Amino acid sequence: MEHNCNIHIGQLIREQLKADQRSVGWLSREIGCTRNHVYKIFNKSSLDSDLIFRISKAMNFNFFQYYTAAFLENLKSRIGEK
């Protein structure tokens, strides 16, 4: 099974946190982890779906939308190949 998803979720979370003018300390408190762990999240290109859900809920932002968009784009290209 080919997995070709060019989403760097950690980077997207960092960018949204900055856009929301929220701190790393704020996010760490909201999701119940250390600031150091949040910095590690920023460096990860993929995360567990439960963690993405917790972050989405805390930030009131649907990070799953990036995966949905990538899935739909892939589906369109596969349909176009047939």
Regions found by a protein language model. Give the residues of each.
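A detector for short, charged/polar N-terminal pre-domain segments
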Residues: M1-H8
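Residue-level detection of the helix-turn-helix DNA-binding "recognition helix"
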Residues: K18, N43-K44, K57
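DNA major-groove recognition helix of helix-turn-helix/homeodomain DNA-binding modules
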Residues: D50-Y66
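Short, charged recognition helix plus adjacent turn
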Residues: H3, E15, Q21, K40, ...
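Recognition helix of helix-turn-helix/homeodomain-like DNA-binding domains
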Residues: G32-L47
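Short basic helix-loop element that most often maps to the first helix and adjoining turn
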Residues: I9-E30
